[in-house]
């Protein structure tokens, strides 16, 4: 190995377990569109997608065209939905690579229709309805007129109708009421499309939280993301899901040294030893995605014992107070995220809490310079 002993192990057996949890949570016959955008939330979307395809996943969701093309070029032939839609000039590749795309304006629909007609193909689209997210989508009040126009575009295949919950991960009364209102608006839009003779193959609004927490009988597809990777949508789901983290970010102790009382550690001297302390230097830092916000807040696992990050997180290094770790030695494994060999875990939810963010950002932030090593693949 020419780099460092800092790697991210990806346990595909844990991915299979989490996928099975989704299967058990949704009604029989409901499809699963796995969200693999942003490099499968930092887990490596090629290997993740191949594993999910072997499990019989219905489809994949990506953010933009290039991600969809990468899946096709890697041999993935399941349906792939571009959740963010295509931009002007991308329509030909979208159709040519047999990718489906979200559509949220008539201009998008018209250009896709014209492009597909010239290619003697059908463009597969999912009409996105804005039911309350306020980000992308046809306004629900404008949906009937949109669908009427769509009926005249003969080179489009209405593969789906889609929306997105804004607060399905919030299980308080206000969050539930808003999600229920979104679901009702979406159901009405779907009914309006069908009353006009349109027959979408897929109807979907449920993300990870809604897949586990809501009854949506008019839908036949769910879109899990974060739960596949072993983290909860929010703290409201604590104890409600039997998930396993699939990423283990690990490194090793590179140096040990005793420091005397009053010794400062790292940039800006944000930590000063209160007494004689044993400090370990570990080759991982914010350039690897171990956030600087974890300065004097993070914890790691060494020999099954939790030990605190002390001093400012550097670009390439962190320092750990290992005074209380029995027998600690240079070369010992350090678990920064995920579970160690004894089953003790530092959860993404914990890192997110310490860093003032969410597990999604923790996963997505693990940088490309950290090699991914895949374990327990089925093929």
Curated annotation (Swiss-Prot):
Keywords: Isomerase, Pyridoxal phosphate
Molecular function via GO: alanine racemase activity; pyridoxal phosphate binding
Broadest EC class assigned to this enzyme: isomerase
Record's keyword annotation contains Glycoprotein: no
SMART domains membership: Ala_racemase_C (SM01005)
Source superkingdom: Bacteria
Cellular component aspect of the GO annotation: cytosol
Needed cofactors: pyridoxal 5'-phosphate
Keyword Transport: no
Modified residues (N6-(pyridoxal phosphate)lysine): 37
Binding-site positions, substrate: 135, 315
Catalytic activity: L-alanine = D-alanine
Pathway: Amino-acid biosynthesis; D-alanine biosynthesis; D-alanine from L-alanine: step 1/1
Record-level GO BP terms: D-alanine biosynthetic process
Enzyme Commission designation: 5.1.1.1
NCBIfam families linked: alr (TIGR00492)
Family recorded in the similarity comment: Belongs to the alanine racemase family.
Function description: Catalyzes the interconversion of L-alanine and D-alanine. May also act on other amino acids.
Protein name as annotated: Alanine racemase
Record organism: Geobacter metallireducens (strain ATCC 53774 / DSM 7210 / GS-15)
Phylogenetic placement of the source organism: Bacteria, Pseudomonadati, Thermodesulfobacteriota, Desulfuromonadia, Geobacterales
Gene for this chain: alr
């Amino acid at each position: 190995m020419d780099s460092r002993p800092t790697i991210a192990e990806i346990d595909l057996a844990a991915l299979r377990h989490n996928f099975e949890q989704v299967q058990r949570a949704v009604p029989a016959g409901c499809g699963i569109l796995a969200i693999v955008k942003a490099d499968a939330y930092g887990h490596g979307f090629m290997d993740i997608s191949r594993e999910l395809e072997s499990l019989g996943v219905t489809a994949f969701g990506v953010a933009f065209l290039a991600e969809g093309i990468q899946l096709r070029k890697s041999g993935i032939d399941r349906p792939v939905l571009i959740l963010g839609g295509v931009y002007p000039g991308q329509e030909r590749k979208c159709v040519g690579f047999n990718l489906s795309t979200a559509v949220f304006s008539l201009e998008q629909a018209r250009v896709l229709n014209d492009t597909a007609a010239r290619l003697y193909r059908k463009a597969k689209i999912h009409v996105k309805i804005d039911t309350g997210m306020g980000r992308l989508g046809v306004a629900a009040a404008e949906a009937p007129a949109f669908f009427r126009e769509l009926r005249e575009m003969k080179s489009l295949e209405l593969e789906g109708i889609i929306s997105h919950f804004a607060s399905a991960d919030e299980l308080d009364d206000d969050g539930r009421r808003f999600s229920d209102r979104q679901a009702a608006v979406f159901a009405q839009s779907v009914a309006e499309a069908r009353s006009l003779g349109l027959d979408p193959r897929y109807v979907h609004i449920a993300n990870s939280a809604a897949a586990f927490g809501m009854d949506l009988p008019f839908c036949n597809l769910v879109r899990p993301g974060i739960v596949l990777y072993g983290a909860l949508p929010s703290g409201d789901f604590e104890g409600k899901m039997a998930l396993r983290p699939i990423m283990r970010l690990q490194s090793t102790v590179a140096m040990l040294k005793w420091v005397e009382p009053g010794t400062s550690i790292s940039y800006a001297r944000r930590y000063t030893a209160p007494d004689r302390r044993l400090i370990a230097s570990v080759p991982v830092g914010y350039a690897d995605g171990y956030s600087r916000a974890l300065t004097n807040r993070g914890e790691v696992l060494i020999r099954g014992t939790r030990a605190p990050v002390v001093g400012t997180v550097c670009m390439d290094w962190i320092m750990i107070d290992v005074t209380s770790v029995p027998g600690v030695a240079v070369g010992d494994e350090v678990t920064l995220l995920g579970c160690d060999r004894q089953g003790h875990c530092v959860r993404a939810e914990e890192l997110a809490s310490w860093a003032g963010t969410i597990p999604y950002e923790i996963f997505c932030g693990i940088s490309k310079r950290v090699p991914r090593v895949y374990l327990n693949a089925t093929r």
